C-alpha cells in the first residue's frame, strides 16, 4: 500500500458508508472504492481484513437490514466458520464500511472512526449527511 493509498469496502446504499467516503474524499484522498455487495468476497480476503481490523466474523456480522436472522446466524451456537461461509455467499452480511490505510484497517462505525486512519482531515466544518457535526470550523474533531 503506497503512502496515500486508501481502500474502502463500500455500500453506496448505506449512509455511514457514504459519510466515510465523503470524509476521505474531502480530505483530498482518491480512494479505491470496492462495492463489495456487487463484487463479493473470498474467504482469504475476509480473513485478512478481519485479522487486520481485529474483528471476528461474528463481530463483523451485519445483524440489521440483512438476512442474518433468516439464516439463523444470530444463534450463539453458530460458528465463525459458518458465518464466514454465509458472508461469502451473501456479501451484504458484512458490516461496512471497512477502510484500509497505511495507518491500519478498521470497521468505520460510526463514520468519524475513519479520522483515526487519515494523516490529514478535511478543513472544517464538516457534517454527516444527517447534519451531525464531526469536524468544527477550526478543523477539530467534535466528540459527542
UniProtKB/Swiss-Prot annotation:
Protein's GO biological process: response to arsenic-containing substance
Site (Important for activity): 10, 62, 96, 109
EC top class, as a word: oxidoreductase
The keyword Protease belongs to this UniProt entry's keyword annotation: no
InterPro entries (alphabetical): Arsenate_reductase (IPR006659), Arsenate_reductase-like (IPR006660), Thioredoxin-like_sf (IPR036249)
Function: Catalyzes the reduction of arsenate [As(V)] to arsenite [As(III)]. Does not constitute the major arsenate reductase in cells: essential only in the absence of ArsC (AC P74313).
Protein name, UniProt field: Arsenate reductase ArsI1
Amino acid at each position: 500500500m503506497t503512502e496515500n493509498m486508501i481502500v474502502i469496502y463500500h455500500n453506496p446504499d448505506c449512509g455511514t458508508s457514504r459519510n466515510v467516503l465523503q470524509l476521505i474524499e474531502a480530505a483530498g484522498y482518491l480512494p479505491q472504492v470496492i462495492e463489495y455487495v456487487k463484487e463479493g468476497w473470498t474467504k482469504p480476503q475476509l480473513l485478512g481484513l478481519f485479522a487486520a481490523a481485529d474483528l471476528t466474523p461474528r463481530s463483523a456480522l451485519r445483524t440489521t437490514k440483512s438476512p442474518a436472522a433468516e439464516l439463523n446466524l444470530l444463534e450463539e451456537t453458530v460458528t465463525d466458520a459458518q458465518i464466514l461461509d454465509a458472508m461469502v455467499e451473501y456479501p451484504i452480511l458484512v458490516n461496512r464500511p471497512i477502510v484500509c490505510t497505511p495507518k491500519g484497517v478498521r470497521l468505520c462505525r460510526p463514520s468519524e472512526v475513519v479520522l483515526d486512519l487519515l494523516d490529514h482531515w478535511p478543513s472544517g466544518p464538516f457534517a454527516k449527511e444527517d447534519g451531525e457535526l464531526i469536524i468544527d470550523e477550526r478543523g477539530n474533531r467534535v466528540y459527542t
